[in-house]
Amino acid sequence: MTQTHPIHVFSEIGKLKKVMLHRPGKEIENLMPDYLERLLFDDIPFLEDAQKEHDAFAQALRNEGVEVLYLENLAAESLTNQEIREQFIDEYIGEANVRGRATKKAIRELLLNIKDNKELIEKTMAGIQKSELPEIPSSEKGLTDLVESNYPFAIDPMPNLYFTRDPFATIGNGVSLNHMFSETRNRETLYGKYIFTHHPEYGGKVPMVYEREETTRIEGGDELVLSKDVLAVGISQRTDAASIEKLLVNIFKQNLGFKKVLAFEFANNRKFMHLDTVFTMVDYDKFTIHPEIEGDLRVYSVTYENQDLHIEEEKGDLADLLAKNLGVEKVELIRCGGDNLVAAGREQWNDGSNTLTIAPGVVIVYNRNTITNAILESKGLKLIKINGSELVRGRGGPRCMSMPFEREDL
């Protein structure tokens, strides 16, 4: 926290001082094979090992002098009185689309009976199985209760929460509180709402450049802060162009200091779900990139003049474009998997491009992406390698699992 701003992020590579994570919890154990697609998962991580891997990730950050915050703690600290607590519970139930009146009442009573705030937050994250509620007489069941009688959950779990990068994004001194691609993940942004409204340190003290009530979608994996002057945003499977326009108008109007935005349009599919799964900044003049996006990639330059956005498609070489906008002589694009198409596909799927830079040239990576890691090391980068055999099953890497709150200026 700076003296005047609790959020301070003006680059992707400035020394990381403070970061928010979420330790995977019981929500992971509420994944079932029949409902993986509904919950945006491809597989079921083993929770015990996922927690060990995540704890090692957090410790690696602490070893580098980073203060680690946890989403579950910040959310719990935001429930500062009984009125806010009940408001949170009612909003949580409302957004879970619980339609049966008797079911709503039973869920509300269950949650109100949890007196510890952190336990309450973790329960809302884990979801609520129907077996946890008292039997509801048939005469009191709503149509939804009857139609979905075989579905085991009264409220779905939120297994994607350990990817803290997406529900909101820190941009300069502000925050984009996102409206997410799927209903499953959109509920996650409720925690950010309460943190930035009611938390003793952050509530009401951070300018909002996007609100979760918007109807168009945007996710934090598509929001990158390249420098104090330049942002990059992805037009992807999870983020649409209309959201980007709203975001950019707000950023420019809030006078956060940014002068230009580079909008990257690339393939719309799950393996390239966010810009940061195919493109991350690792040093002043170096980026990782997945070679498969390069052929179809289109880049637009966006500025704000006379109360309006000015958009122009950029032509030519991506490395030259980045160098020009970052004020460096030359930019090197380091290809995930090198020149081998098979290795590139495999290591991108396992988040070889999704690196977390904690200082210029110092990067946290999954140890499993051996080819990409060897290339990064050959370019002079210092790698901090973590095990992610279970964490990667959720299709996210170190950048996906972290939300910077404070970085040193470059």
Curated annotation (Swiss-Prot):
SUPFAM superfamilies: Pentein. It is found in: Cytoplasm. Pathway: Amino-acid degradation; L-arginine degradation via ADI pathway; carbamoyl phosphate from L-arginine: step 1/2. One of its GO terms (cellular component) is cytoplasm. Pfam families: ADI. It comes from the Bacteria. GO terms for molecular function: arginine deiminase activity. Belongs to the arginine deiminase family. This is Arginine deiminase. The gene is arcA.
